[in-house]
């Protein structure tokens, strides 16, 4: 009896000892980095905050505290290095072996499987090579037609939403637009998300994206086995099944259509597309001399839909929000629209070639991505020891590449809190000092697609509307952005009490979002 009691009492101590010993080497090696002091077992988890917004503020605070350089922090027994050094970024992003994603991406596995976002090793290399032609110039032109069609529907919808000088959340509206575009381009189907917001598939996309963001900051729910005990797990399972069934059904029908040599052209058929969809390209591709199986097709289509929807929603939303606050830049953009398209032709779609001629629009989007990058962090996991810029980084470490910090480094970008698109004509950041779409062999394969969609939507909105802030008083009079992201602690705390309820509260998980929405008004141009 006493023996059993001793064992029972000793187990927690043995567990603590095991966990501490298992991290001993990593702790010893990583001690050379600056970083906040933590507690045994807990690390720095208790210091980081209770939600994604507080965590982002904390990480920025540490970045300032440690000289805007790399630093180490611990989440329990998980070691993390926040990376902003250009030499580190160059090594990591150029590496052919350091390509394993961090554990946070495991939250997407049940939905996405091991597609291009989450796979590694030979599978990733083969699939990357196979998928690259899907973003060829000619295919992007086809995709652009789809973007224009859906943007036209979006403009009509916005006219209704914005009527009567209504203040509305643009981020919420953009979600449905980008969902329509991605389903159309990825699978050749129209789900009409802008019109059918309550449909099961539209709601499933929204619920799944929310679920991934929520679980990322819930230690117990991040564990797949423990999450099965959570009260919201049954709802998650239903959402997952809805998405899987939807995608698999379309893939099966598309395979049959390809086998028969024809795709239905009946009016009203939801599977009709005049142009090649991403799925059609995959069905025409081979790996090791064989066609892709159903599982591989599902993984890559689902991955393309997730990456192409969530990141583009962020990019479009923050760009339009910045239009509302920075009226001088908006006037320059409208002037460019008239110069490129002609004063009397602003009501038509911009062609693929015309979008490429909009140089100030390109500068504006670059500056928008500098201050509000769609992907704020990239996580890589070291499966072996690496020597980076003379430092030993031990096996088992997560490298968090702080892309959102790069835009606020005054050594690279003078006066970083001033929104100034022209800076990209005058200031030339190094290849690893500004990487909103990552860089190197594992850069964002769909970055041209994303930029084309953002430019197409922003261009059409500018031609149809004056974009106004939620309240006139919120227009930036000095060119500075309204968020306190990236400011030193003392200055941020001084400004926080004066933040307006319509100023965005930023949160960062896999993509950058505003927790309180992005509120604007629109005034039709005549």
Curated annotation (Swiss-Prot):
Q: Which cofactor does it need?
A: heme
UniProt superkingdom: Eukaryota
Keywords in alphabetical order:
Endoplasmic reticulum, Heme, Iron, Membrane, Metal-binding, Microsome, Monooxygenase, Oxidoreductase
Subcellular location per the Swiss-Prot or TrEMBL entry: Endoplasmic reticulum membrane; Microsome membrane
Residues the record lists as binding heme: 307, 444
As for what it does, the entry says: May be involved in the metabolism of insect hormones and in the breakdown of synthetic insecticides.
Q: What is this protein called?
A: Cytochrome P450 4e2
Tell me the protein family, please.
Answer: Belongs to the cytochrome P450 family.
- InterPro entries hit by this protein: Cyt_P450, Cyt_P450_CS, Cyt_P450_E_grp-I, Cyt_P450_sf, Cytochrome_P450_Monoox
Its EC number is 1.14.-.-
Its GO CC terms are: endomembrane system; endoplasmic reticulum membrane
Organism listed in the record = Drosophila melanogaster
Task: Say yes or no: keyword Iron present.
Answer: yes
Provide the topology term for how it sits in the membrane. Answer: Peripheral membrane protein
The enzyme's main class, written as a single word, is oxidoreductase
Question: Cross-referenced PANTHER family, in alphabetical order?
Answer: CYTOCHROME P450 4D1-RELATED, CYTOCHROME P450 FAMILY 4
Q: Does the keyword Glycoprotein apply?
A: no
What would be an example GO MF term here? iron ion binding
Kindly report the protein's main subcellular placement as a broad class.
endoplasmic reticulum
């Amino acid at each position: 009896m006493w023996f059993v009691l001793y064992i029972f009492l000793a187990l927690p101590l043995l567990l603590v000892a095991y966990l501490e010993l298992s991290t001993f080497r990593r702790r010893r090696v990583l001690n050379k980095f600056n970083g906040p002091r933590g507690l045994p077992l807990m690390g720095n988890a208790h210091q980081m905050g209770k939600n994604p917004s507080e965590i982002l503020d904390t990480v920025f605070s540490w970045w300032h505290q440690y000289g805007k350089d790399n630093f180490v922090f611990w989440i329990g027994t998980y070691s993390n290095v926040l990376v902003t050094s250009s030499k580190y970024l160059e090594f990591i992003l150029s590496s052919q072996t350091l390509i394993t994603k961090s554990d946070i991406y495991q939250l997407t596995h049940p939905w996405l499987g091991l597609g291009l976002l989450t796979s590694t090793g030979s599978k990733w290399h083969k699939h990357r090579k196979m998928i690259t032609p899907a973003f060829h110039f000619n295919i992007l032109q086809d995709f652009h037609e789809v973007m224009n069609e859906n943007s036209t529907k979006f403009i009509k919808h916005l006219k209704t939403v914005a009527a009567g000088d209504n203040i509305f959340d643009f981020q919420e509206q953009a979600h449905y637009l980008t969902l329509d575009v991605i389903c159309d381009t990825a699978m050749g189907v129209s789900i009409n998300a802008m019109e059918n917001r309550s449909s099961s598939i539209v709601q499933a996309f929204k619920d799944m994206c929310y679920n991934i963001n929520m679980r990322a900051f819930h230690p117990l729910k991040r564990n797949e086995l423990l999450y099965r005990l959570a009260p919201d797990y049954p709802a998650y399972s239903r959402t997952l099944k809805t998405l899987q069934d939807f995608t698999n059904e379309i893939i099966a029908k598309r395979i049959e259509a390809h086998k028969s040599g024809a795709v239905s052209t009946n009016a009203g058929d939801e599977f009709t597309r005049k142009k090649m969809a991403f799925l059609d390209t995959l069905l025409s591709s081979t790996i090791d001399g064989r066609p892709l199986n159903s599982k591989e097709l599902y993984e890559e289509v689902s991955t393309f839909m997730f990456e192409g929807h969530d990141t583009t929603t962020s990019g479009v939303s923050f760009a339009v929000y910045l239009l509302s606050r920075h009226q001088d830049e908006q006037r320059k953009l409208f002037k460019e629209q008239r110069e490129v398209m002609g004063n009397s032709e602003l009501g038509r779609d911009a062609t693929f070639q015309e979008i490429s001629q909009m140089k100030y629009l390109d500068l504006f989007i670059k500056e928008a991505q500098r201050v509000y990058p769609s992907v704020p962090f990239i996580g890589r996991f070291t499966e072996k020891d690496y020597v980076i810029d003379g430092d030993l980084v031990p096996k088992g470490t997560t490298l968090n590449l702080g892309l959102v910090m790069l835009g606020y480094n005054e050594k690279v970008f003078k006066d970083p809190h001033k929104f100034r698109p022209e800076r990209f004509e005058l200031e030339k950041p190094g290849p690893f000092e500004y990487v909103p779409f990552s860089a190197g062999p594992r850069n964002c394969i769909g970055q041209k697609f994303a930029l084309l969609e953002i430019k197409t939507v922003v261009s059409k909105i500018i031609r149809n509307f004056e974009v106004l802030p939620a309240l006139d008083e919120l227009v930036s009079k000095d060119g500075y952005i309204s968020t306190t992201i990236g400011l030193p602690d003392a200055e941020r705390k001084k400004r926080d009490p004066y933040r307006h309820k319509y100023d965005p509260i930023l949160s960062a998980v896999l993509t950058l979002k505003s927790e309180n929405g992005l509120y604007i008004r629109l005034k039709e141009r005549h």
